[in-house]
Structures are given as structure tokens and as C-alpha cells.
């Protein structure tokens, strides 16, 4: 792709690592993988849902399957030992990436951010929450957090409170001070909103939580892929994110937890791998993090996860952040040229790398369908934030989200496709 102006990253070189970006779309989808009748170039702007995977990560996974595929922690033969080393080292690599000095003992591999949230909610929340306690969230939470803690509160008798979102899409921090009090046992907050793009002051919220003896759980699904994150600087007690949003494979995520807290928690799932000893009467558990990883783990995905971290580190997370924020600001500026487009969230220079919006009198799903005909892949719906959309007074929104391989020209193609939709629905 021809570069219009300078970027914080080498877009052309990065795009060369992602063959999928060169494909065309628009043909018959009944036989996935056959693209002979596809004719429309792909413009992929759905990165908040999932990023694409570079060849370096695919190669690492293929190397595992071709070279040392074996179950881990269960064999003394060479392949098992080699796979075990790779899988354990992947934990250390991910820990290093997010600034977790405790290494593998503070990083649990899960399926995704949602499972990480459920692990803490069930393994910690069921034991620690009760009547008179409160869990504080925000009005912009993803369902992974909101629904999980909502249901745990119903089981335990705890109260759920929500920090207000103001008209600009930012948290009302004075309201947060009112809600986080001596009854609060958990503050669960999204770092970067997947709908508004808001970057929340998680360090300040961590301080508020700790002042009253509460823990804080940060949903980092949209932040770890897009900006430098140091969980110890934030002072998060728990922090979760997913591999598939950061150039990694699907089916793997990570839960960071402070070691002393994880030590005190019981397992979430039971079975093989997570036990130390078993009798007919009782069982004891493995050390961290393995007591939380029951059964055969996602070994190939772990290898790919580590490779994705290496890939992003080579680019530099400061550069990743600068690039996606540049594109988000450019998209914000382009979209604000039109009076019939409503944008949700803070201004373009004060958000993460996504823009959610609606075109007047056109449902988000209809707009998405028209954009799809132009080859532009965006996301339409409530983005797993139904209560937030209710607050915004809309059933759905259209979301464009950007990553390291996108360019301004693709934003221009988005705007051109919206123009085509506007003419069609006029």
C-alpha cells in the first residue's frame, strides 16, 4: 500500500507480514477458503474484534506442530520436555511484556479475557463476597465484566454499582469517589473502552480501590494490544487480555494476578494438570500458575502468543500506540466533516484506536452491509455493551478500529463507502 505521509511504523513492511490483507472479498462464502470469485479488495477495520496474524506467528505455531508437538508436564521423553519448556517460557515472555516481575507464577493462560474474568469471579468472588459488600464497575463495561460480576453478586448477595459515563464518554471520577467506599471489595474497570475508545485512568482508580481495602481488576483486552502496559505501575491486582487481538492465535488469553492473591485463591477448574497429589479422600494443588490451568493446556496457542509478543516488541509498543491513535484521530476528523454522522466517545486526540458512530436514519447493520459490498470490514451492533448503548439512546453503532497495518488511505475508503451508503439511503 502506498504511504501518503510518514507514519510511526513502516506500514508497507508490516503489511507484507499479513498475506490476508492482499486478498479480495465479495464472492460465495459457502466454501470458506475458496476465493476464486472474490473481486473486491479488502479494507480491514475490525481490529477491536480481532487482529490478523503475521507470518512470524503462524510459522512459530507450525514449527511447534512439525517439530515438537507433545503434551506438556506429563512425559520425560524429549518432545514432551521441549514442549514443556516452550510453554513455560511463553508464560515468562508474556509476563515480561506486561511488566509482571513475578514471571510465570503471576500469569495464567486462559481461553480469553472472558474466561479470565470468570476465573477470578468464581475462584475469588464466591468466597469473598457477601451481603453488605459492593462491586464497582463502570457504565462502559464489556459484558465479559458486567454480566460476570452481576451474576456473582446475585449468588453472593453483594451489590453492584456503576460509575457514570459523562456526555463526552469519560468516567465521572467524582462519582467514582462516591461509589468506592468501605463496602467495596472489587473494582472492575475496562482500561480502553471497546465502544467509546475512552482510555480510563486505571492507576487513579487503583489508588481509590486500595485506599478502602478493595482489589481492582483491569480489563486490558483493548489496551495491551495497542499501547505499553505495565501492570505494576498501574498497581492492578488482576489484569486480563486476549492473544487474538494482538497478532496472536485465537483460543488463548492471559490473567495476571498478584502472586500473594493468587496463592490464596482456590482453583476454578479441577482435573488433570492442576493437581499435586490425589487420594480417594482429597487432593492438593500444583504451584502457580498451573493450579489454574486444568487439563491439557493450549500449547500451540501459547507458543504463538509468545511469538506475537516478540513481533509487537520488535515494532515497539510506543510506535503501535502512536500509529493507531494517529489513524483514529484522522478518522475522527474525516467523520466530523459530515453533519449526519454522530460519533460516540471523546475527541479524536483523546481516545484509543477506534471510532464508533452512526449515520442518521441508517441502522448500523444496514450501513455495515453496504460497507461490506465495498470491501470495508467494520463491526456493527452493540459491541457487547448493551447497557451503554441504552444509555446512548441507540440500539447499535458502527465501529471502525485500526491497527499497525492500516493506513490513512483505508480511512478514506471508509469515508467513500459511507458516502455511497448515504446516496443509497437518501
Curated annotation (Swiss-Prot):
Optimum temperature is 55-60 degrees Celsius in the presence of 0-0.5 M KCl and 70-75 degrees Celsius in the presence of 2.5-3.0 M KCl. DTT increases activity up to 46%, but has an inhibitory effect at concentrations higher than 5 mM in vitro. Optimum pH is 7.5. Remains partially active at pH 11. The keyword Transferase applies. It catalyses: (sulfur carrier)-H + L-cysteine = (sulfur carrier)-SH + L-alanine; L-selenocysteine + AH2 = hydrogenselenide + L-alanine + A + H(+). One of its GO terms (biological process) is cysteine metabolic process. SUPFAM superfamilies: PLP-dependent transferases. Keywords: Lyase, Pyridoxal phosphate, Transferase. GO terms for molecular function: cysteine desulfurase activity; pyridoxal phosphate binding; selenocysteine lyase activity. Its cofactor is pyridoxal 5'-phosphate. Gene3D superfamilies: Aspartate Aminotransferase, domain 1, Type I PLP-dependent aspartate aminotransferase-like (Major domain). Transmembrane segments: none annotated. The active site is at 384 (cysteine persulfide intermediate). Homodimer. NCBIfam families: sufS. Catalyzes the removal of elemental sulfur atoms from cysteine to produce alanine. Able to reassemble a removed [2Fe-2S] cluster of an apo-ferredoxin. Shows a selenocysteine lyase activity approximately 280-fold higher than its cysteine desulfurase activity. Belongs to the class-V pyridoxal-phosphate-dependent aminotransferase family. Csd subfamily. This is Cysteine desulfurase.
Amino acid at each position: 500500500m502506498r504511504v501518503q505521509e510518514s507514519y510511526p511504523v513502516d506500514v508497507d513492511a508490516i503489511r507484507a507480514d499479513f498475506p490476508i490483507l492482499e486478498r479480495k472479498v465479495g464472492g460465495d462464502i459457502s466454501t470458506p477458503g475458496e476465493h476464486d470469485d472474490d473481486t473486491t479488495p479488502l479494507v480491514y477495520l475490525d481490529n477491536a474484534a480481532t487482529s490478523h496474524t503475521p507470518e512470524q506467528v503462524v510459522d512459530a505455531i507450525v514449527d511447534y506442530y512439525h517439530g515438537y508437538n507433545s503434551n506438556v508436564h506429563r512425559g520425560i521423553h524429549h518432545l514432551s520436555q521441549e514442549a514443556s519448556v516452550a510453554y513455560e517460557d511463553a508464560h515468562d515472555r508474556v509476563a515480561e511484556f506486561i511488566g509482571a516481575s513475578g514471571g510465570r507464577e503471576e500469569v495464567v493462560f486462559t481461553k480469553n479475557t472472558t474466561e479470565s474474568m470468570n476465573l477470578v469471579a468464581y475462584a475469588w468472588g464466591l468466597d469473598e463476597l457477601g451481603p453488605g459488600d459492593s462491586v464497582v464497575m463502570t457504565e462502559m463495561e464489556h459484558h465479559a465484566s458486567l454480566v460476570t460480576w452481576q451474576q456473582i453478586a446475585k449468588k453472593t448477595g453483594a451489590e453492584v454499582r456503576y460509575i457514570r459515563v459523562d456526555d463526552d464518554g469519560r468516567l465521572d471520577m467524582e462519582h467514582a469517589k462516591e461509589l468506592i467506599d468501605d463496602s467495596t471489595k472489587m473494582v472492575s474497570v475496562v482500561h480502553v473502552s471497546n465502544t467509546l475508545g475512552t482510555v480510563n485512568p486505571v492507576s487513579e482508580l487503583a489508588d481509590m480501590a486500595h485506599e478502602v481495602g478493595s482489589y481492582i481488576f483491569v480489563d486490558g483486552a483493548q489496551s495491551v494490544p495497542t499501547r505499553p502496559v505495565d501492570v505494576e505501575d498501574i498497581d492492578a491486582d488482576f489484569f486480563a487480555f486476549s492473544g487474538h487481538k494482538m497478532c496472536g492465535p485465537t483460543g488463548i488469553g492471559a490473567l495476571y494476578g498478584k502472586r500473594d492473591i493468587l496463592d490464596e485463591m482456590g482453583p476454578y477448574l479441577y482435573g488433570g494438570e492442576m493437581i499435586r497429589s490425589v487420594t480417594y479422600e482429597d487432593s492438593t494443588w500444583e504451584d502457580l500458575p498451573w493450579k489454574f490451568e486444568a487439563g491439557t493446556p493450549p500449547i500451540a496457542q501459547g507458543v504463538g502468543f509468545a511469538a506475537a509478543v516478540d513481533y509487537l516488541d520488535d515494532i515497539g509498543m510506543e510506535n503501535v500506540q502512536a500509529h493507531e491513535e494517529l489513524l483514529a484521530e484522522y478518522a475522527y476528523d474525516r467523520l466530523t466533516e459530515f453533519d449526519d454522522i454522530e460519533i460516540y466517545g471523546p475527541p479524536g486526540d483523546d481516545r484509543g484506536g477506534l471510532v464508533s458512530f452512526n449515520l442518521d436514519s441508517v441502522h448500523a447493520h444496514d450501513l455495515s452491509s453496504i460497507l461490506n459490498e465495498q470491501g470495508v470490514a467494520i463491526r456493527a451492533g452493540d459491541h457487547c455493551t448493551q447497557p451503554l448503548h441504552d444509555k446512548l439512546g441507540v440500539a447499535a453503532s458502527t465501529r471502525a478500529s485500526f491497527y499497525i497495518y492500516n493506513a490513512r488511505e483505508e480511512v478514506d475508503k471508509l469515508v467513500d463507502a459511507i458516502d455511497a451508503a448515504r446516496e443509497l439511503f437518501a
